[in-house]
């Protein structure tokens, strides 16, 4: 079977790595990923030029295309590939609105009475935002309606001082058509612990993966700018230390109800559904959906797959997805980034990656925003690579990952607290306080 992975980051490297032993592997990427280029035939080009991607797939007799990033999904890459006879792991443009149009997602919850929603309003002018916030006596979250690479959301009490600043940021979002819409969503701020559940979907059935928790803040202690994610962990048993089986099951039910609603409102959803939840005193609440794997969370779950990913892909396109099995391990992912990220890029600087020692430690490296030139790896400004380790406990996996992070030399930084016992316990205690 010939499988094409579309995308160039660490998420796509993890997807390719999970497929490499069972398929003839191809990749279409905007820049050469040093890890993917070793294991796949590839073409370099803009992943958003969907006709060119489809031509590459047809020319190489691709059986299944696996779409990594959100931007091509929003442009209709799946529709274009399927028009050319290529089956896809990824939703159609219409179904991908679950991520690309947050107002569509919230309205879906409203229209189909799906549990786990929250107070929200969509606005297209500043005066209405101002009037609403004058009467709203709780902190809020301000979100552009469309895609902003995970960096457009601002929270009162974190990035914004008060609801007055929320008004000003809302005006900026509308005036600049941030995310491609002249609209803004205002949501109530939830108090709790965030967690992620990702699931394989075949249009009808949903096979959930182990839960994970991301760490979006740039610096240790959960401070600094919100990034695409500085690392994440998952636990043995598929839950998290603060997440019960009942809460996990409730979140999965919300995702199943969403899957049914998308099929009625748009088209059957095939691919990966990523649910970002907040565990609150009232149970799990849906923060947002992504129409693809999370980055970094893909790196937690894909190395734990027991069922071959190639078999899962075939089941998704055939519509007969059943239970997907994972090895019962914990995992920790730590992102290596340019020192001072996200304000400083160190673009063009060389880093050294001792892949052999990382492998000998039992960890994996997944490359992201780096370039390869004359066998040297260069930073290109954003998150550089993910280091992932698994173990019988989060503590064991974290220690391996931390040792492996020392195998990267250069002007780089990582959050050494991701997955540590102290930080995990802080999450557990926070949840206990909320529930009591």
Curated annotation (Swiss-Prot):
Coiled coil: none annotated. Mg(2+) 1 binds at residues 276, 288. Mg(2+) 2 binds at residues 288, 290. It is an enzyme of class 6 (ligase). Binds 2 magnesium or manganese ions per subunit. ATP binds at residues 133-196. GO terms for biological process: 'de novo' IMP biosynthetic process; purine nucleobase biosynthetic process. GO terms for molecular function: ATP binding; metal ion binding; phosphoribosylamine-glycine ligase activity. Its cofactor is Mg(2+); Mn(2+). This is Phosphoribosylamine--glycine ligase. It comes from Methanobrevibacter smithii (strain ATCC 35061 / DSM 861 / OCM 144 / PS).
């Amino acid at each position: 079977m010939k499988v094409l992975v579309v995308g160039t980051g660490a998420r796509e490297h993890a997807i390719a790595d999970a497929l490499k032993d069972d398929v003839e592997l191809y990749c279409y990427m905007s820049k050469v990923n040093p890890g993917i280029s070793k294991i796949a035939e590839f073409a370099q080009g803009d992943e958003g030029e969907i006709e060119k991607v489809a031509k590459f797939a047809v020319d190489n007799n691709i059986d299944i295309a696996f779409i990594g990033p959100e931007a091509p999904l929003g442009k209709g890459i799946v529709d274009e590939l399927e028009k050319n006879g290529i089956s896809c792991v990824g939703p159609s443009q219409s179904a991908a609105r679950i991520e690309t149009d947050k107002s569509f997602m919230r309205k879906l919850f409203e229209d189909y009475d799906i549990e786990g929603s929250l107070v929200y309003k969509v606005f297209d002018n500043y005066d209405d935002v101002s009037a609403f916030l004058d009467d709203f006596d709780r902190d809020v979250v301000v979100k552009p309606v469309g895609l902003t690479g995970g960096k457009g959301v601002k929270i009162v009490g974190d990035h914004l001082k008060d609801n007055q600043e929320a008004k000003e940021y809302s005006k900026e979002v509308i005036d600049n058509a941030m995310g491609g819409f002249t609209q803004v969503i205002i949501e109530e701020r939830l108090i709790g612990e965030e967690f992620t559940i990702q699931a394989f979907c075949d249009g009808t059935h949903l096979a959930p993966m182990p839960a994970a928790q991301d760490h979006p803040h740039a610096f240790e202690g959960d401070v600094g700018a919100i990034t695409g994610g500085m690392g994440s962990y998952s636990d043995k048993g598929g839950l998290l230390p603060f997440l019960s089986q009942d809460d996990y099951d409730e979140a999965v039910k919300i995702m199943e109800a969403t899957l049914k609603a998308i099929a009625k409102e748009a088209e059957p959803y095939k691919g990966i559904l990523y649910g970002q939840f907040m565990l609150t005193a009232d149970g799990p609440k849906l923060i947002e959906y992504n129409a693809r794997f999370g980055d970094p969370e893909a790196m937690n779950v894909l190395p734990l797959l027991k069922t071959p990913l190639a078999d899962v892909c075939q089941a998704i396109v055939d519509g007969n997805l059943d239970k997907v099995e994972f090895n019962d391990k914990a995992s920790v992912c730590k992102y290596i980034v340019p020192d001072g990220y996200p304000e400083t890029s160190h673009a063009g600087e060389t880093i050294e990656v001792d892949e052999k020692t990382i492998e000998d430690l039992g960890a994996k490296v997944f490359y992201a925003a780096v370039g390869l030139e004359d066998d040297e790896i260069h930073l290109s400004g954003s998150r550089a690579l993910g280091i992932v380790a698994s173990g019988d406990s989060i503590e064991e996996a974290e220690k391996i990952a931390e040792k492996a992070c020392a195998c990267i030399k250069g002007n780089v930084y990582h959050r050494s607290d991701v997955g540590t016992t102290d930080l995990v316990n802080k999450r557990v205690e926070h949840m206990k306080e909320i529930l009591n």
